[in-house]
Design a protein with these regions (language model features):
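Aromatic- and glycine-rich peptidoglycan recognition patches
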Residues: 11
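Active-site-proximal, glycine-rich beta->alpha crossover segments in alpha/beta enzymes
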Residues: 7
Length: 216
């Protein structure tokens, strides 16, 4: 839930650098994109239980959350979604706010739960570690400095773009909605708690550190 600048201050950025070196032989440089994710469907849910049984185009990002909500995740490539919505193969999808209008998906799935989750996009800049180590210290420092300077403007750019896109979505008839404060919290807590449980299985020794440096 941290901004890229906050990640650098908290120690999470340094953790990512070490992790990518150890696991991928890559130098983590920084984030290139910032966006929340949403669940879109062909009907409005008055309560969380109304989401049960909905067939949703998914990706690894959404799978656990959708299953916990009682949805039925359906894996398919994004070019197939439009036809799948028209034929009733899926009732909705998980996606940021940028894209569904352009792809025509909102014609069949115009209801979106306006509670963004996982705001830190996984679109990041990496460099092969051997290539990175072949650069001069001055070049390395310059790359990091440029990226660090770029990130706040990048976040502002995507926030502005998202706000502009919501205006177009509203005009196109998209219905944004939430639940009660208590249910909104339950919804978002579920999304994050599931990922923490998954991390506890994958990297049990790192979870306490990750919670501390991410403020979660």
């Amino acid at each position: 839930r941290l901004s890229p600048s906050e990640e650098r201050k908290s120690g999470y950025y340094d953790w990512l650098v070490k992790r990518h070196m150890a696991k991928l032989n890559a130098r983590y440089i920084g984030r290139l994109h910032s966006s929340g994710f949403y669940l879109w469907a062909n009907k409005k849910a008055d309560k969380l239980s109304d989401l049960k049984g909905l067939k949703m185009r998914t990706g690894s990002l959404y799978d656990r959350f959708m299953r916990a909500l009682g949805m039925v995740p359906v894996t398919m490539n994004s070019p197939e979604v439009h036809t799948a919505l028209e034929r009733g193969v899926v009732d909705g999808f998980g996606w940021p706010n940028m894209g569904p209008r352009q792809r025509g998906w909102i014609k069949k799935a115009k209801y979106v739960i306006d509670l963004p989750f996982f705001g830190a996009s996984n679109v990041v800049a990496l460099m092969n570690l051997d290539k990175w180590n072949g650069l001069s210290k001055a070049s390395q420092d310059k790359i990091i400095a440029i990226t660090e300077k770029y990130e706040p403007g990048m976040v502002a750019h995507f926030k502005s773009g998202a706000a502009a896109e919501w205006k177009k979505l509203d005009a196109a008839g998209v219905v944004r909605y939430t639940f009660s404060d208590a249910v909104n919290k339950q919804y978002l807590d579920m999304a994050y708690d599931l990922e923490w449980k998954n991390l506890a299985k994958k990297v049990p020794g790192d979870v306490d550190t990750l919670r501390r440096i991410t403020g979660n």
